[in-house]
Amino acid sequence: MTHSRSLNPFWLFKTLVLTGFLLGSVGAFAKENNALDPAQIMVFTKTTGWRHSSIEAGVKALKTLGEKDGFEVTQTEDAFSFHPDNLKKYQLVLFLSTTLEVLNENQQKAFENYISNGGAFMGIHAAADTEYEWPFYGKLVGAYFESHPNDPNVLTAQMRVLDSKHPATKNLPLSWTRADEWYNYKNINPDIKVLINLEEDSYSGGTNGANHPIAWYHESLGGRAFYTGGGHTEASFEEATFLDHLSGGIAYCLGSD
């Protein structure tokens, strides 16, 4: 004769509680480890138009910032990196002086989905001279390049910080003077929140007038987006104040501000 043994309700309850505790502990451990993992940033430097000699200096500076601020940089010029399985590895995609058409239609769609689902974007300088026929990107970067002064193209100008509470500006002087190639912009996205205005009476060649944005952010497309117009020169990436500006922009994009 066989005897069936019913489970004691107390022991069943205790077993379930212990199992739940262990599973919860594993989940918490995984979350804690993920939180400790350095943020991953993809720095995209593909150019099909003008190529800035400052790109390499910019990549080097961003990697150095990563060592200080706790993020890792992967630099690529391969548009095939814009695949859903690859994009999901990164918390931020940064366009460093990219120019003209850099992604095909499928890659554009993958990037749109990445941003719509909360991925972050940051653009430096000629990121505004990129993908003129892609409306989503135009809104994402915030404005397109229209022109810049010539002979010389690099000029010293004064900027005015409009929002000193943002991570990208909180350590900047309210009146900031530096040398760079100052872009004039067109198709400015009305959703951008301007952080810094370029004072056109401080240099020659400005065409945007009294409202000449040079750094801004927005969150109108799903994820965080930040752009700064500086970074034409190699010297830019050796300036402590400009690097602090970039560091703050990255912190904002990563949500670590």
Regions found by a protein language model. Name each.
Residues Y137-V141, R178, Y185-I192, T241-L243, ...:
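Oxidoreductase and adenylate-handling cofactor-binding alpha/beta cores
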Residues E101-N171:
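A glycine-rich, often tryptophan-bearing local segment used as a flexible ligand/cofactor-contacting loop or short
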Residues Q40-T130:
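Helical hinge/lid and interdomain linker segments adjacent to catalytic or ligand-binding clefts
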Residues F13-S25:
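Bacterial N-terminal signal peptides
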Residues N150-G222:
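Catalytic beta-strand/loop cores that center a nucleophilic Ser/Cys/Thr
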Residues A28-A30:
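Boundary at the C-terminal end of the N-terminal hydrophobic targeting segment
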Residues M1-W11:
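N-terminal secretory signal peptides that target proteins for export/translocation
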Residues N33-A39, T45, T64-F71, E77, ...:
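Extracellular ligand-binding/catalytic regions of CAZymes and related secreted enzymes
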